[in-house]
């Protein structure tokens, strides 16, 4: 019963991670954030692998899923520090998230709750991708939205890591017990002796 509840809980956590990652992937696509897009794609693949490992009793899949979650927590911690400019991180210094391919930063920058976007006239030779706008009236600035999204990812990843370790441990214990029982039976098994119903009688040679 405990194993079943652990498996069901882990599948539920993986489904929440999958939904959160897909939602995040959509907005990163809209904002041309190529580095998060690649990371989200890998995360979605590994989460699906974790679901398959849970349903099909594959402890190795869950171990790989747990290792990835540790990397996923580190990546999201970096995103939080990047957008909140913690330490030496600065979002205005290097366009890391889009590999410096455009001036886009985050979809939430111009589409956040309550944001009013006002176009600013730029140089006549400026490219369309480098348009200038002013954003005012936002109820929550986009760095905080991105940080909250990463915090949610970390929260789900921590729960997934704990349950993945627990379920994989249960799976490995069961595999060891099955191996032990199988080896014990193989040594203790003896083939039944076939009994013959023929009666042997002595032969007498005539004198």
Curated annotation (Swiss-Prot):
GO biological process: regulation of sodium ion transport
Coiled coil (residue ranges): none
Residues that span the membrane, as ranges: 2-22, 35-55, 62-82, 147-167
Compartmental location: Cell membrane
Keywords: Cell membrane, Glycoprotein, Membrane, Transmembrane, Transmembrane helix
Membrane topology type: Multi-pass membrane protein
One Pfam family in the UniProt entry: NKAIN
Glycosylation sites (chain numbering): 100
A GO cellular component annotation in the UniProt record: plasma membrane
Stored InterPro entries: Na/K-Atpase_Interacting (IPR008516)
Keyword field contains Repeat: no
Predominant location: membrane
Origin superkingdom: Eukaryota
Keyword Transmembrane in annotation: yes
Assembly and binders: Interacts with atp1b1 C-terminus.
Protein family per UniProt: Belongs to the NKAIN family.
Protein name (database record): Sodium/potassium-transporting ATPase subunit beta-1-interacting protein 1
Gene source species: Xenopus laevis
Gene: nkain1
């Amino acid at each position: 019963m405990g194993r079943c509840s652990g498996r069901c809980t882990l599948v539920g956590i993986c489904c929440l991670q999958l939904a959160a990652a897909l939602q995040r992937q959509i907005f990163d696509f809209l904002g041309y954030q190529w580095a998060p897009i690649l990371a989200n794609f890998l995360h979605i693949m590994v989460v699906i692998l974790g679901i398959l490992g849970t349903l099909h009793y594959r402890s190795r899949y869950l171990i790989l899923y747990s290792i990835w979650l540790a990397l996923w927590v580190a990546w999201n911690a970096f995103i939080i520090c990047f957008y909140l400019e913690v330490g030496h991180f600065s979002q205005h210094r290097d366009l890391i998230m889009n590999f410096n391919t455009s001036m886009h930063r985050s979809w939430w920058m111009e589409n956040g709750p309550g944001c009013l976007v006002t176009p600013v006239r730029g140089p006549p030779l400026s490219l369309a991708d480098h348009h200038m706008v002013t954003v005012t009236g936002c109820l929550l600035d986009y760095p905080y939205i991105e940080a909250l999204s990463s915090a949610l990812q970390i929260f789900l990843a921590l729960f997934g890591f704990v349950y993945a370790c627990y379920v994989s441990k249960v799976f490995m214990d069961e595999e060891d017990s099955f191996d032990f029982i199988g080896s014990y039976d193989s040594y203790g098994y003896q083939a039944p002796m076939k009994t013959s119903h023929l009666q042997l009688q002595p032969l007498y040679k005539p004198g």
